[in-house]
């Protein structure tokens, strides 16, 4: 909205310096600063309101160190989503469908996560929203994104085609499997971020790094010259995704101000599902979804640890009559907790690994 107002003033009166509103880098920076300030200013009052009202339930089987979090307010994802939506509303162009598709994803999965948190902490329903209803919400979002991009002419250039990391001219056409692939990626990534949200600052910090990288890819993909030079798909108008990405990044950083150890608030499923869906949709829109196992490798490893733990336990129980475990506890961050690693050390090391995955993903731009 502020973009359109300033653009009107610039076109009508041509004041010196206001033409900067047309630059993606300026609006991305403005969205980032706005998002950060919203979190920093609103955070203390929001946390004060939630304290004593919305308290995160802690599982009995959680590591001893983790049980200390039982007095922490949750649903901090509301603050993240609010900061993102307001910043994007102010600085992004809404004639670009990429923008509001991401916003729909963030809002929709935020609502699903909110229902889950609300049922757990307010209604005291054990387990919160039943998994099948979460899955239905994720499938519906994937179906909407898939169908919209399939039928909207704005996406007809590439449509169901995507690129393969490390290969210059290799592409894959999903064909009739495009929509199922979209559903799978949105479901998998949103659940992966949700699983990672177990330690102070882990999900918010890791998400900020991943989305920052995706925003960089989006900026390059939205520029025909850069896209041609780097052999990545040119996404007409896709540069607007960079504006949205920076709003998401700094909302995570602003939230991290209060979520870093010792945390004052937890994002809950409200935030983790919303962030996961944003990562998935951005990657899909810029045709970099096959890069996610590298770029979002920490989320992939967390999910893999849970899958391996469950499958191995079931196999050994069937084979030997007693279930055995690969890890002391899954997801992976709890394994290291039980090995005696300090929470801050786990989080910082996971951030470092995420940065390394980020650098590896950048290498794919030239190693083709």
UniProtKB/Swiss-Prot annotation:
Cofactor(s) listed: Mg(2+)
UniProt-listed InterPro entries: Glycosyl_transferase_4, PNAcMuramoyl-5peptid_Trfase, PNAcMuramoyl-5peptid_Trfase_CS
Compartment(s) where it occurs, according to its Swiss-Prot or TrEMBL record: Cell inner membrane
Protein EC: 2.7.8.13
Bilayer topology: Multi-pass membrane protein
Enzyme class: transferase
Family: Belongs to the glycosyltransferase 4 family. MraY subfamily.
Protein name: Phospho-N-acetylmuramoyl-pentapeptide-transferase
Organism: Chlorobium limicola (strain DSM 245 / NBRC 103803 / 6330)
Lineage: Bacteria, Pseudomonadati, Chlorobiota, Chlorobiia, Chlorobiales
């Amino acid at each position: 909205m502020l973009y359109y107002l300033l653009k009107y003033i610039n076109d009508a009166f041509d004041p010196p310096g206001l033409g900067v509103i047309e630059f993606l880098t300026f609006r991305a920076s403005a969205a980032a600063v706005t998002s950060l300030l919203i979190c920093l200013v609103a955070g203390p009052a929001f946390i004060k309101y939630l304290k004593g009202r919305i308290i995160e339930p802690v599982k009995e089987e959680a590591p001893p160190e983790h049980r200390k979090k039982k007095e922490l307010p949750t649903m901090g994802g509301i603050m993240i989503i609010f900061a993102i939506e307001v910043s994007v509303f102010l600085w992004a162009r809404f004639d670009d469908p990429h923008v509001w598709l991401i916003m729909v994803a963030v809002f929709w999965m935020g609502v699903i996560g909110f229902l889950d948190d609300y049922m757990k902490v307010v209604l005291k329903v054990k387990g919160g929203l039943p998994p099948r209803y979460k899955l239905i919400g994720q499938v519906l979002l994937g179906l909407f994104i898939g169908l919209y991009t399939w039928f909207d002419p704005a996406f007809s250039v590439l449509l169901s085609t995507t690129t393969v990391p490390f290969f210059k001219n290799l592409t894959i056409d999903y064909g009739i499997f495009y929509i199922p692939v979209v559903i799978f990626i949105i479901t998998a990534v949103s659940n992966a971020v949700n699983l990672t949200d177990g330690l102070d600052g882990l999900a918010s910090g890791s998400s900020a790094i991943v989305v920052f990288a995706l925003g960089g890819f989006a900026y390059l993909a939205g520029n025909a010259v850069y896209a041609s030079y780097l052999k990545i798909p040119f996404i007409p108008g896709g540069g607007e995704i960079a504006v949205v990405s920076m709003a998401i990044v700094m909302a995570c950083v602003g939230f991290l101000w209060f979520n870093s150890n010792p945390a004052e608030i937890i994002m809950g499923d409200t935030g983790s599902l919303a962030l996961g869906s944003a990562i998935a949709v951005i990657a899909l829109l810029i045709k970099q979804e096959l890069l996610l196992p590298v770029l979002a490798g920490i989320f992939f490893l967390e999910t893999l640890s849970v899958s391996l733990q469950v499958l191995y336990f079931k196999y050994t129980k069937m084979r030997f009559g007693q279930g055995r475990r690969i890890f002391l506890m899954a997801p992976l961050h709890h394994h290291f907790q039980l090995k005696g690693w300090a929470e801050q050390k786990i989080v910082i090391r996971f951030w470092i690994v995420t940065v390394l995955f980020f650098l590896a993903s950048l290498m794919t731009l030239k190693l083709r």
